[in-house]
Regions:
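Active-site glycine-rich loop that binds ribose-phosphate moieties when present
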Residues: 118-132, 154-160
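A glycine-rich beta-to-alpha transition motif near the start of alpha/beta enzyme domains, typified by
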Residues: 1-112, 144-191
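RNA pseudouridine synthases
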Residues: 126, 134-136, 144
């Protein structure tokens, strides 16, 4: 199978994008997607996305994690997919993802750079997990823990622990946040 792949970068993440509007990539397996995302033996990426026809909108987004398994909504990925859709001639940027409807707009479109504004779902609920940690869903699950000093915190160790914690079936994104005066400095583990 010949695969026409595109590579997009957004806010520190990189993604492989395939135009699947004719469903020619529906036969890709978990192992094949994992291999494509492998940074040593494939194209390399934090995930793979398929641009597909939408049911209610012009297009939809299917997201796969780098391990090859289908994932949930990814904001950085969504912005990259909208830029890709624009480069493919799509002009209406309302689309469907696993968490529902999204609206985006292109603020600036260049050949190699695109600025995209993406409306994520509103977060109406969150679950307090401990005194300083919370679980919430932004379209994908997030464990958020407030820490004293994010630069000194063992992000890798704690991130690995929480990423696949038994309470979060299917895994979760892990964010460690330090309050700095009136602003916030986040540091994320994983995707």
């Amino acid at each position: 199978m010949i695969i026409h792949a595109y590579k997009y970068h957004g806010a520190g993440n990189d993604f492989i994008i395939l135009d699947n509007r004719k469903f020619q990539y529906n036969s890709l397996t978990t192992e094949q997607i994992k291999l494509l995302c492998d940074r040593h033996f494939g194209i390399g990426g934090d995930g793979l996305m398929l641009l597909e026809p939408g049911n209610r909108y012009e297009f939809s987004m299917r997201y796969f994690n780098a391990d090859g398994h289908e994932g949930t909504m990814c904001g950085n990925g969504g912005r990259c997919l909208v830029a890709f859709a624009a480069h493919k001639g799509i002009t209406n940027f309302e689309f469907e993802a696993t968490d529902g409807h999204h609206h985006a707009e292109i603020l600036e479109l260049g050949e190699r750079q695109c600025i995209v504004k993406l409306k994520m779902i509103d977060i109406n609920q969150y679950q307090q997990y401990s005194e300083n940690s919370y679980f919430l869903n932004t379209g994908s699950p997030h464990y958020v823990e407030f820490v004293e000093d994010v630069m000194e915190y063992p992000v890798d160790e704690k991130g690995k622990y929480w990423r696949w914690h038994k309470d979060f079936k299917g895994g979760t994104n892990v964010n460690f946040v330090e309050n700095v005066w009136t602003s916030v400095l986040p540091k994320q583990f994983g995707l």
